[in-house]
Amino acid sequence: IKIFLLTVILCLPGCTKNIVVKENVFSTSCKEKILIFPFKNMAAVYGENVNSRCPICGKVFMTGEVAEDADNMLTEQLFILLKDRKDIQLIPASQSQGVVSDLLSEHQKRLSERDLLVETGRALKADCVLSGNIFRFRERVGGKYSVDLPASVAFDIHLIRVSDGRLLWNDHFDETQRPLSENLFRLGPFLQRKARWITANEMAVSGLKDVLKSFPVPNKPEPKQ
């Protein structure tokens, strides 16, 4: 019986080794206003199943299927997860749409990705812009306890200062859920997920929460003597 139970556990869903990597975490010199820029579908730009480089941080991801409306879902979740913070003031992504259209028309689409973010933030009087790219957002095929194809999600996120275009902070999430037998070191997430195969939405929201754990806090002014 013990051998049987061990075999069952090892076949239950775990995840890949790499979920979140903390990198380039700076103490920001932003004041308060941060524009949430809509997530961009990079598979629509580069195609599926190719190695693509992030135009902001340079990290390479394998693209894949991106479910319909995944970009809007992640953009909305990013806003929800940050909106209650007292140290920042968010500008919703919806306010950027008209500005982006005008900038692309004015510059005949020759702006770099970073310049587009900076100019949009400047037009909306933001101190920083928080943007992200989606490389994969593949839904699971199957149910909670048995799948033909597991969920797979990859995205990155960046905080850029408007005044000089400097990248202040960035982080990323990259996971394809695997059976625990393929990675016994992922027992923690395996237990948190109640030994089941999760959806792409669940994976993405969980990954976004993990990524935001390293999100920097704006500098506070020195107290007057």
Q: Where do the language-model regions lie?
A:
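Bacterial N-terminal signal peptides
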Residues: 2-13
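Short N-terminal micro-motifs specific to bacterial/archaeal maturation
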Residues: 6, 108, 191-194
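Secreted/luminal cysteine- and crosslink-motif detector
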Residues: 12, 16, 55-58
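C-terminal/domain-edge helix-coil "capping" segments
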Residues: 15-46, 120-124, 136, 147-154, ...
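N-terminal segment of the mature soluble domain
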Residues: 42-133, 162-170, 201-218
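Extracellular loop and loop/strand-boundary signature of outer-membrane beta-barrel proteins
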Residues: 142-145
